[in-house]
């Protein structure tokens, strides 16, 4: 099977994932992650603030910058900071661009996908060199998407993430105060807070495992379960089926797509 390689051998690549809650940055050299850090997402993020952050954290000669963004209001600020500091134009990953991958993403249907989900699915198949995957990303939202090397993207489900669900409940329940979510010690809580905590977290365990078993039965495929996302730590200890945990899956997918992009930017 063909292995995707970086077209620019030895290139230093800055990979950026702009999410609703945080922005992840990773510096790669020779296809290996060297530095990783995060910055809170602010819709009023200024050029000066971002430039200073990049200068402090990534003061290197960067050859390429690949970006996934689900917060378009930040994109222009990012472009200006990248061009000013590194003198390169960033490539924004999108589902509707052309890529030289080892499989066809759209054998059956052409989906309109967020660039983060798109990167996750490509990362699952290409990075792990597997045939079928169920990819879960627990962040601001909970996305669960299935992909097959033979049949392409099969579709998915999107729910609110753990803290999104908790905040919605707190805002609509007069007597419920804010608290920090944690991995439940047991299924049944003995106080309101413990019960809410258990309810918020356990729903993802049963959702993930339920979808996993249903898909393996309906599609007759050996889906590999891959879990990522900044809030996945709340659910991972509870999952009772085999899974792969990779906090950097989205970044890996962005890097793979950037290297596989067919065109100029």
Swiss-Prot record:
Q: Which residues form the active site?
A: 116 (proton acceptor)
| Cofactor(s) named in the record | NH4(+); K(+)
Reactions this protein catalyses: (R)-pantothenate + ATP = (R)-4'-phosphopantothenate + ADP + H(+)
Q: Which UniProt keywords apply?
A: ATP-binding, Coenzyme A biosynthesis, Cytoplasm, Kinase, Metal-binding, Nucleotide-binding, Potassium, Transferase
Q: Which InterPro entries match?
A: ATPase_NBD, Type_III_PanK
Q: Which free-text remark accompanies the cofactor?
A: A monovalent cation. Ammonium or potassium.
- Quaternary structure and interacting proteins, as annotated: Homodimer.
State its role. Catalyzes the phosphorylation of pantothenate (Pan), the first step in CoA biosynthesis.
User: What is the protein name for this chain?
Assistant: Type III pantothenate kinase
Q: Which organism is it from?
A: Borrelia hermsii (strain HS1 / DAH)
Recorded name of the encoding gene: coaX
């Amino acid at each position: 099977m063909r292995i995707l390689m970086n077209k620019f051998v030895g290139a230093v690549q800055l990979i950026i994932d702009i999410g609703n809650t945080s922005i992840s940055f990773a510096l790669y050299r020779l296809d290996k992650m060297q530095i990783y850090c995060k910055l809170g997402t602010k819709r009023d993020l200024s050029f000066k603030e971002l430039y200073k952050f990049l200068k402090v954290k990534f003061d290197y000669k960067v050859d390429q910058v690949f970006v996934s963004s689900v917060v378009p209001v930040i994109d222009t600020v990012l472009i200006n900071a990248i061009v000013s500091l590194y003198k390169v134009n960033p490539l924004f990953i999108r589902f509707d661009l052309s890529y030289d991958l080892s499989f066809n993403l759209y054998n059956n249907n052409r989906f309109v996908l967020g660039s983060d989900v798109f990167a996750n699915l490509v990362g699952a198949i290409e990075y792990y060199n597997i045939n079928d995957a169920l990819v879960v990303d627990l962040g601001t939202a909970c996305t669960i998407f299935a992909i097959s090397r033979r049949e392409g993207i099969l579709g998915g489900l999107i729910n609110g993430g753990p803290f999104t669900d908790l905040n919605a409940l707190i805002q609509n329940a007069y007597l419920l105060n804010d608290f920090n979510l944690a991995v439940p010690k047991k299924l049944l809580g003995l106080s309101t807070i413990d019960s809410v905590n258990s309810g918020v977290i356990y729903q993802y365990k049963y959702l993930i495992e339920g979808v996993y078993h249903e898909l393996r039965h309906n599609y007759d495929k050996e889906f590999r379960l891959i879990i990522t996302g900044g809030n996945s730590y709340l659910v991972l200890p509870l999952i009772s089926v085999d899974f792969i945990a990779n906090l950097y899956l989205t970044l890996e997918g962005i890097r793979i797509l950037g290297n596989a992009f067919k065109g100029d930017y």
